[in-house]
Amino acid sequence: VRSRRQRQMCIRDRPDTLRYPASLTKVMTLYITFDALNKGIIKMNDDLKVSRHAANMAPSRLGLRPGQKIKVKTCIEALIVKSANDCASVLAENLGYTEANFAKTMTKVAHELGMKNTTFKNANGLPNKAQKTTARDMALLAAAMYHHFPQYYKLFSLKKFTYNGKTIYTHNNILKTFAGADGMKTGFTNAAGYNIITSAPVSYTHLTLPTTPYV
């Protein structure tokens, strides 16, 4: 558990044990996307092209088709609410030319943020034995997201969004059941188990809980 105000760990249990990040990977994909938005490299209403590679991603996905176009804003909402693997790959390919190249940037940025035990191999968190992180590193990423991109951080509290006339609801049940919870991301693969980064104001501070995995 990390205090946002004090910027330090206040409770810990095996914070440096290597784990598979599963869909917590998407928080870094979004971090780099928000950085690109801040720098004017992309805009929320820009159209992104969907490749066959992205369209063929395993679930969870939005159901994109090769050759179609999708807005940056929709991709972001789909990552946060539905944890859409196809949308993560779309962002990666449009920002990094290939997903593998984007993953190298993800790892580089992670190390710059002090996430020394993290390696990314894809943008969505689908199984890869070389893709690893720790609870401590995920706490650092969550803090960096809040402090560097406060204007976008509120998106992590989205409970639903609309795509093609259909309302899609969040996987993050803590947003529905814990008063004050304001994000961030859940994840699951068979190899990783269930994991989560969540945050909420408590008394005079704001606590972030990254757990990899939780049961």
Regions found by a protein language model. Name each.
Residues V1, R5-Q8, R12-R136, A143-H147:
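Active-site-adjacent loops and short helices of periplasmic peptidoglycan-processing enzymes
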